[in-house]
Amino acid sequence: MNENSMEFFLPDLNATDQWGQQLAQQLPLGTIILLQGDLGAGKTSLVQGLGRGLGITGEIVSPTFTIVNEYREGKMPLYHLDLYRLNTLEVEYLYPEQYWQGEDFPLGITAVEWPERLPQLPSQYLQIQLCHQGEGRSIALTAQDWAMDLKELLPPS
């Protein structure tokens, strides 16, 4: 793996949540997270941790049927998009860029589940691939045009 990729293991969903909370403290305003993994891999659990780390006290739920959930009560907004039920053309009409361009919505952290349905990837993002591994999850981080050192995002040993 090169300097733009890293892998590590989280032993359970609680650790995934804890890492999400840690991540929220480190990510800069305007971060786009592309979440990949099978159904039930822990994508929403990670976003729940991100929300807690941002100080969001309300319930954070999967936007599978609402497509987008917006949480604005934390230290910065959190936008959670789930594109699972949409095709590329439907995603294009959703205009997901509005959540990370900072023009129509205040900048925050945008987490996108099923990003392969995006008609075009953003120019800068952090991709997080979650894979089942027993009770835990293997995590692969990949950065695209990312200024931050990925080692800073690793969970504590």
Curated annotation (Swiss-Prot):
GO terms for molecular function: ATP binding; metal ion binding. Pfam families: TsaE. ATP binds at residues 40-45, 135. It is found in: Cytoplasm. InterPro entries: P-loop_NTPase, T6A_TsaE. Keywords: ATP-binding, Cytoplasm, Magnesium, Metal-binding, Nucleotide-binding, tRNA processing. GO terms for biological process: tRNA threonylcarbamoyladenosine modification. PANTHER family: TRNA THREONYLCARBAMOYLADENOSINE BIOSYNTHESIS PROTEIN TSAE. Belongs to the TsaE family. This is tRNA threonylcarbamoyladenosine biosynthesis protein TsaE. It comes from Synechocystis sp. (strain ATCC 27184 / PCC 6803 / Kazusa). The gene is tsaE.
